[in-house]
């Protein structure tokens, strides 16, 4: 089962992940923080191979899994360059591969899809689904409604508490942005940064249910117009 934690910044998603992780006996769970710290002097392949051996995998199997993960996650330089040279996205994918080499029964991943490209995101979600299908419990935090909707269940966090839980569609309905504001007690008010206002006075402000003056509907969650152009 894949459970997604969703909520505004500071709502308690990371705290909940840590608390859940701490309830397990050593070795029964793995936790990957939002900003993981991993060895950087070796390549991803070498690191994964070493960790596989630490997990008592046979040498050939550890090497095989390391090779597959570097390829599956498209880690650029995964077999040839030190992790210290990686981009933020490839660094993040390497950190996730560490728990994929031999997953524990419970995985707690804080913003695992942040900073990775769209294709890598789909690949990571596919791996998480495979792990879940093997009977493991996967819990992730996310700010992305499209990711939350792919989870089996979600928990909405507010003020360090779970304020709603259940199937994504049942909890968030057809308007996730507005529903999250309601559950979180948040507001989408007028922008107070008056020095950034249009000097011509044109009404180009956008928000839930609003349209720009040009009539191009804009998503408050992404800032993109309906035709894909940024405002």
Describe each PLM feature range.
Residues 82-89:
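Conserved ABC ATPase signature
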Residues 118-120:
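Helix N-cap at the start of a conserved alpha-helix in ABC-type nucleotide-binding domains
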Residues 49, 61-78, 97:
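Conserved ABC ATPase "signature" region
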Residues 161-184:
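Conserved beta-strand-loop-alpha-helix hinge in the C-terminal portion
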Residues 107-111:
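Catalytic Walker B motif of ABC-type/P-loop ATPase nucleotide-binding domains
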Residues 141-143:
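H-loop/switch region of ABC-family ATPase nucleotide-binding domains
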């Amino acid at each position: 089962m894949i459970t997604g934690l969703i909520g505004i910044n500071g709502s308690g998603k990371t705290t909940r992940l840590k608390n859940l992780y701490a309830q397990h006996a050593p070795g029964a769970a793995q936790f990957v923080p939002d900003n993981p710290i991993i060895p950087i002097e070796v390549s991803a392949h070498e690191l994964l191979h070493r960790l596989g051996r630490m997990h008592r995998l046979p040498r050939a199997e550890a090497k095989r899994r390391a090779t597959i993960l570097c390829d599956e996650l498209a880690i650029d330089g995964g077999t040839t360059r030190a992790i210290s040279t990686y981009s933020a996205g490839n660094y993040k994918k390497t950190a996730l591969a560490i728990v994929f080499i031999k997953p524990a029964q419970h995985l707690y991943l804080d913003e695992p899809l942040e900073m990775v490209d769209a294709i890598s995101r789909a690949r990571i979600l596919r791996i998480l689904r495979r792990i879940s299908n093997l009977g493991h419990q996967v819990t992730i935090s996310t700010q992305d409604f499209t990711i939350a909707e792919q989870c089996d269940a979600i928990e909405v966090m507010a003020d360090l508490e779970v304020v709603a839980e259940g199937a994504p569609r049942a909890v968030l309905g057809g308007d996730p942005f507005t529903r999250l504001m309601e559950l979180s007690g948040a507001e989408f008010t007028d922008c107070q940064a008056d020095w950034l206002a249009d000097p011509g006075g044109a009404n180009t402000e956008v928000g839930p249910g609003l349209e720009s003056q040009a009539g191009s509907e804009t998503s408050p969650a992404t800032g993109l117009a309906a035709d894909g152009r940024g405002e």
